[in-house]
Amino acid sequence: MTISKLIYNYFYPRKKRGFVGFLPLFLCHFAFEQVQAEVAPVYVDDQFELPSGFHIYKLAENNATGGSYDIIFDGQGRILVGDTTSVRRLEDKDEDGIYESYKVIATGLGGRGPQGLLVYGDNLYAVGGDGVQLYSGYESGDALKHQGRLGARFNTGGDHAAHTLLRGFDGYVYLVTGDGGGVKDRTHITEETSPVLFERAASVFRFDQSGTRWECVSTGSRNPPSLGMNYLGEFFSMDSDM
């Protein structure tokens, strides 16, 4: 006798069987068929140079990600993408490792953006529109409330404009912008203690969570498209043409 038959006999003794007893088996069989019908991941290993033992598969199709100018994880491991004008939270409802749907949680971020995203506590910071935008209510799971722009205006959406946001080990939010981001003199610097006194071309800024205190920590580059940080808090970037 099979395990499934033993379980069936336990929950549905012979004297109580009938149509009701037959239904759970039908539902279980249907669920099994659904699992069998799931689409297998599409591997694209041949399009990349990978270390031995590593694989890459397509996590989501374009209908879920949109234009996808940026991608991050929030503190719970959920995926956010910028879809050219808004922020989408991708959803894997059947938990098969493929994200087939999404929910728009923030809007009004202009064209070709957002190109910088960061979830920090209950807030979402996004680079789009006229600069760094603050949205609140992230932990509610619903659409977020736009609190407005933080700091002075930045140009966004361009290759040489404002880009990546990072959370530093010191609790500050870090932003990198290219030489087309609108940096000049002390346009964005608010603090006398700023390590860099004047903004010049591409720069890295840091600001507090409220977005009221701004400092410049690096300047003089050309067009860094992104910004990385290692476990020591050191920053890394590159020029887009070098």
Please give the residue ranges for each predicted region.
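Sec/Tat signal peptide C-region and signal peptidase I cleavage site
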Residues: 32-36
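N-terminal targeting/docking segments
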Residues: 13-14, 21, 191, 198
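Bacterial N-terminal signal peptides
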Residues: 21-31
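Beta-propeller domains with acidic blade repeats across secreted/periplasmic ectodomains
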Residues: 37-242
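N-terminal secretory signal peptides that target proteins for export/translocation
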Residues: 1-16
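Alpha-helical transmembrane segments
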Residues: 17-22, 117
